């Protein structure tokens, strides 16, 4: 309340004529014919648009570089398909991972899968898309990387199990 009184007395002294302002002990401004508040504002002129970010290089050598986005994603995708396929064949026929790789049919399917998934992974990257930009709510780019890493470890574990025990992981 005291703050409001002191502010109103200060404001009153600024607009009250000189003779009545002397009781407040403050200097007053000359009385104006009309009491209006003038606010001057200036808008900023049209500014230049922000500079565009340089477009990411879409060279195949940049994408396939050691620290590029493609190698780990492609290998992870191949490992995910390979791990599930190896387990399905082990469960269906009883063939272990190493015996699957030794057969001519297994090598043909491996080569075909590598070619198709590599091209399917490279085409969007070469068009300038990123895995982070295509991420959804459940399956994001980070989850894909971790699933691929675990699938790679799973393939190594399947091979190690077959080498150590002499039998496939899933015995039918």
Swiss-Prot record:
SUPFAM superfamilies: Chlorophyll a-b binding protein. Gene3D superfamilies: Chlorophyll a/b binding protein domain. Residues 1-38 form a transit peptide. Induction: By light. It is a multi-pass membrane protein. The chain crosses the membrane at residues 106-126, 150-170. It is found in: Plastid, Chloroplast membrane. It comes from the Eukaryota. GO terms for cellular component: chloroplast membrane. InterPro entries: Chloroa_b-bind. It holds the Pfam family Chloroa_b-bind. Keywords: Chloroplast, Membrane, Plastid, Transit peptide, Transmembrane, Transmembrane helix. Probably involved in the integration of pigments into the mature pigment-protein complexes. Belongs to the ELIP/psbS family. This is Low molecular mass early light-inducible protein HV90, chloroplastic. It comes from Hordeum vulgare (Barley).
């Amino acid at each position: 309340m005291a703050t409001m009184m002191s502010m109103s007395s200060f404001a009153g002294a600024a607009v009250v004529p000189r003779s009545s302002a002397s009781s407040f002990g403050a200097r007053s401004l000359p009385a104006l014919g009309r009491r209006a508040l003038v606010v001057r504002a200036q808008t900023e002129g049209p500014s230049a648009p922000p500079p565009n970010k340089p477009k990411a290089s879409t060279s195949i050598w940049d994408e396939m570089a050691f620290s590029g986005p493609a190698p780990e994603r492609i290998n992870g995708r191949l490992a995910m398909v390979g791990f599930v396929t190896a387990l399905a064949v082990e469960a269906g026929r009883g063939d272990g991972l190493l015996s699957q790789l030794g057969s001519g049919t297994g090598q043909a399917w491996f080569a075909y899968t590598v070619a198709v998934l590599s091209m399917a992974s490279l085409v969007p990257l070469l068009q300038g898309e990123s895995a982070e930009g295509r991420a959804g709510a459940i399956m994001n780019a980070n989850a894909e990387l971790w699933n691929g890493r675990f699938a790679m470890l799973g393939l190594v574990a399947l091979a190690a199990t077959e080498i150590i025990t002499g039998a496939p992981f899933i015995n039918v």
